[in-house]
A protein has these predicted regions:
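Bacterial N-terminal signal peptides that target proteins for export
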Residues: 2-13
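Bacterial N-terminal signal peptides
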Residues: 11-21
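Boundary at the C-terminal end of the N-terminal hydrophobic targeting segment
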Residues: 24-28
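Short coil/turn linkers that define WD40 beta-propeller blade boundaries
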Residues: 34, 135, 180-183, 229, ...
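Immunoglobulin-like IPT/TIG beta-sandwich domains and homologous Ig-like subdomains
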Residues: 38-48, 59-60, 67-78, 83-90, ...
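Glycine-centered tight turns/hairpins at beta-strand boundaries that repeat
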Residues: 39-42, 49-65, 70-73, 87-90, ...
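Proline-enriched interdomain boundary motifs that mark the N-terminal boundary
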Residues: 137, 289-291, 383-392
Length: 496
């Protein structure tokens, strides 16, 4: 925020059938690993904020407007060849940019705040909730006492409640989504918070606490303990991850090994780095930080996305200094940063315009406020210990009915894609993917009422419900539960 709003408005920007294998590998996108490929059907709008619904479709906001569109994967479960269709818009007075979002345990999506509204500086506290079944966005009551206004961080706790930040101080507000709309909010004092929430991102940890790296009280980091309604120090990141002038900071990503890879903006002068952009690694078990590799060549992440990949690597989007064009993508493998292929608009964009979304196919969807939407296909694969495991399921299902499925690791080993205060695209919830044995057609069946919204749930038995579409293909089929591109081994079902 920095006294006056940072001006980060986007300027003008110059099929193979993959069958489900018996081992349950991901429904992979049909192009070369390690590369970005533009989706076949160009969207009829400038694509901005993406969210993954629990029926496998991706909804995307049109940049700076109230309009939304839906990307539906093709009949083989491939997003590269998916088709676009309009869905209901936000309420007519709400067209946010840089705001808080979440997909909830009941399958609805929710949005709050906005640093801009219809591309005008506003620090709006408006919000809305989306019901996919009714195809409606409905206005919600703003959080009290300034929470929810502007570019807010937000998080869904394992028990399903949604918390949004007050960017002006360390306070926040929380709601039980069952009260939405209109939403009943409870104010949470910023007890123990060392600085205000502005510019900081929140990462959900396996114990249900929140980790943040401070943008003002750097190099301090903090954890929010929900049971105590209190912030406590998580120690020094050792290297600075914020630009002290703009207070911008990079995204952080939970990895399967119980660490959080946090990235930084460099210290800049006249938008140029005067020292390298740093990274640091938080080990949850010890509560300690270790400096990671620096970004090379004057690159950093002064706002921008990152995403976990199925193999545990982290994809990050960098650019030079503060809001300077020239994107370079990297994969972090736990020790080093490795350059990868770049998106089509890399030369004409800074990192902050980009959004990532972890797809159930294992690919990473990218939007940048233009009609160029691309998917990154990682080259690595996952450790079998990270797979969801199905322990209880219906062997026979009837079209039009709802069923419960149980197992372990349904919510994945990470939150998925991250950004920070300006955008949240988490996908730590289970999807159900079904392949018909005769036609090999692939469909996602809507899940809802997940028993947890946690991460790295380990050996705990968790569950979700799934709806069998009335038009589902009948006969013998294979079902997998998938989270962040990692599927379970398939189980056999019969659709009647």
């Amino acid at each position: 925020m920095q006294g006056s709003l940072k001006l980060k408005l986007l300027t003008s920007l110059g099929v193979a059938l993959t069958a489900l294998t018996c081992s349950g590998f991901a429904q992979e996108e049909p192009f070369t690993a390690g590369t970005w490929t533009r989706i076949t059907n160009t969207p009829p709008f400038n694509a901005s904020e993406p969210l993954l619904l629990t029926d496998g479709t991706v909804i995307v906001q049109e940049y700076g407007t109230s309009n939304w569109y839906k990307l539906t994967p093709d009949i083989n479960g491939i997003y590269l060849n998916g088709t676009w269709s309009p869905i209901a818009p936000f309420p007519s007075n709400y067209g946010p940019l840089y705001y808080g979002t979440a997909v909830l345990a009941d399958g609805r999506a929710i949005a709050e705040g906005g640093e801009y509204n219809f591309l005008q500086s506003s620090f709006t506290n408006l919000g809305a909730i989306y019901d996919p079944k009714a195809n409606t966005w409905t206005a919600i009551t703003p959080p009290p006492n300034g929470s929810g206004a502007g570019d807010v961080s937000s998080v869904v706790f394992p028990w399903g409640n949604w918390m949004v930040a007050d960017v002006f101080n360390g306070a926040s507000a929380i709601t039980n989504p069952s009260t939405c709309p209109p939403c009943t909010w409870t104010s949470i004092a910023g007890n123990g918070k060392a600085d205000r929430n502005d510019e900081e991102g929140w990462n959900l940890l396996p114990d249900g606490s929140i980790l943040t790296t401070d943008a003002i009280d750097a190099p301090n980091s903090e954890r929010y303990i929900a049971t105590m309604q209190k912030w406590v120090s998580a120690g020094s990141t050792i290297v600075r991850l914020e630009d002290p002038n703009s207070q911008e900071i990079g995204p952080a990503t939970l990895r399967p090994n119980g660490t959080v890879f946090a990235t930084g903006a460099c210290v800049e002068s006249n938008s140029t780095c005067t020292e390298p952009g740093h990274t640091s690694v938080y080990t949850i078990s010890s509560g300690s930080w270790t400096p990671g590799p620096d970004f090379p060549n004057g690159l950093d992440i002064a706002d921008g996305p990152a995403s976990i990949l199925p193999d545990g690597n982290v994809l990050v989007c960098t650019s030079p200094g503060l809001f300077v064009n020239g994107i370079q993508m990297f994969e972090y493998d736990g020790s080093s940063l490795h350059p990868t292929g770049n998106i089509a608009n890399a030369a004409s964009e800074p990192s902050y315009v980009v959004r990532f979304l972890a797809l159930p196919s294992g690919g990473i969807l990218e939007t940048d406020g233009s009609t160029v939407v691309e998917i990154y296909k990682p080259s690595g694969t996952y450790n079998s210990a990270w797979q969801p495991k199905i322990t209880s399921f219906p062997q026979s299902v009837t079209r039009g009915q709802t069923y419960k499925i149980s197992g372990t690791q349904f919510n994945g080993v990470s939150e998925g894609a991250t950004y920070g205060d300006d955008a949240q695209m988490r996908t730590n919830y289970p999807l159900v993917r079904v392949t018909n044995n005769s036609t090999h057609h692939v469909k996602y069946w809507k899940t809802h009422n997940h028993s947890t919204m946690g991460v790295q749930t380990g050996a705990a038995i968790v569950s979700t419900n799934f709806d069998v579409p009335s038009g589902a293909e009948t006969g013998a089929s294979q079902l997998v539960v998938v989270a962040n591109g990692i599927p379970s081994n398939p189980v056999a079902i019969t659709v009647q």
